[in-house]
Amino acid sequence: MAALVAALLIRATDPTASYVARVADRSGRAGAVLAGALVAILITHAVAAVAGFFLAPHLTPNPKRLFVAFALLAAASGGIWPGKPIEPGEGRHPFWTVAARLTVGGWSGRTEFVTLALAMSGTAALAGIGGFIGSAVVLGVAAIGGDMVWRTLPHRAIGIVLGGLLAVAGFWLAFSALRLI
């Protein structure tokens, strides 16, 4: 459940959603774009969950909690200070274009980093599934709605509010892991 909520909050402020919306709008093939996005996030969240599963036995509970706190704070910084938008580029096959771009970009993604951290501190499979579902909901809305719908949302305000929520949760976990509260 934590991974699902975190993925919803983080992916809503992520440049990948606007990228998916732009490619779906330009290509006119929202289904292919959404399928490519789903394949990419399935791969990246599965790898994050498996990596978290194998890293978990090597850490005690407080470092695991501190790792989750660091992941949430990194995600909060991306929400408060938005990154550069991803340019759609020219691709003839929107499925492969989106799948490749999101898979390669997912290795440094904030959502996948939080999924990795949550997989280390709990049930890895549920963290991977939750991260996938949360990301799929946001990217599905972006692909089906297209660029015109996605552009009308107040992204700056959403980023500040969601980034603030993630920062509060991250600081709370960090202070808890350091036994300051």
Q: What would you call each of these model-derived segments?
A:
Residues 1-53, 114-124, 128-132:
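Juxtamembrane transmembrane-helix termini in multi-pass membrane transport proteins
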Residues 40-44, 95-107, 160-172:
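Small-residue-rich segments of transmembrane alpha-helices in multi-pass membrane proteins
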Residues 74-105:
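Alpha-helical multi-pass membrane helix bundles of inner-membrane/thylakoid proteins
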Residues 171-181:
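Juxtamembrane boundary at the C-terminal end of a transmembrane helix
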